[in-house]
Amino acid sequence: MIQFDNVTKKYPLGNYALNDVSFSIEKQDFVFFVGPSGAGKTTILKLLLKQIKPTSGSIFVNNKDITSKKFHDTLKLRRSFGVIFQDFKILFDRNTFENIALALEIENMQKKKIKEEVEEALITVGLSDKKLVFPVQLSAGELQRVAIARAIVGGRDIILGDEPTGNLDPKTSWDIMKIFKKLENDKTILIATHNVDVVNSFKKRVITLQNGKIIKDQQKG
């Protein structure tokens, strides 16, 4: 489903964000990318979203080479990903329901279908009782649940999380990760994190990066 073949990302000053990285991820895999700041975790997610281009190597998503000059479906590609960043944007003049619905309104989905999708996502993330509440009244953990709900609506089958528990306390981090666990039977999940405690709580595949290289690829459990 996702494949990196000898991917390198080198910046003009000569430093490597990724250096000859190769791995493959199958449908409905749950994979953690771990390592210190600057190891290359976020670079992998940005390459998948085509926010940046690799210096060399190939990246395949659903058997399509997204690094090829012949690839022109960037918008469609991005819509296949549900993305959760640590500093995700939220509109403070819209309530919880409206913030989640925004992702579908952009795609001109029918209002009835939007309501169904958002209601289901609210149940999944445990925010049904907060759907009319505005962001200023939500905790940090609840705001992150809004971000997850926004990522899973619309049938997106690949979830990318960049430090999704980075600013949360241990208990809230655990609660957030339990939501991802509920999604694993339907989604392919890739999470970049330096939170080793969270990673060790899950018996999942862990790809460890250091200085732009994979130093360990381990299936736990």
Model-inferred region functions:
Residues F134-Q144:
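Conserved ABC ATPase signature
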Residues L49:
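Helix-to-loop junction immediately C-terminal to a conserved catalytic motif
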Residues I66-G82, L183-E184:
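ABC ATPase NBD coupling module
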Residues V133-V136, G154-G155, N185:
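Conserved signature/switch motifs of ABC ATPase nucleotide-binding domains
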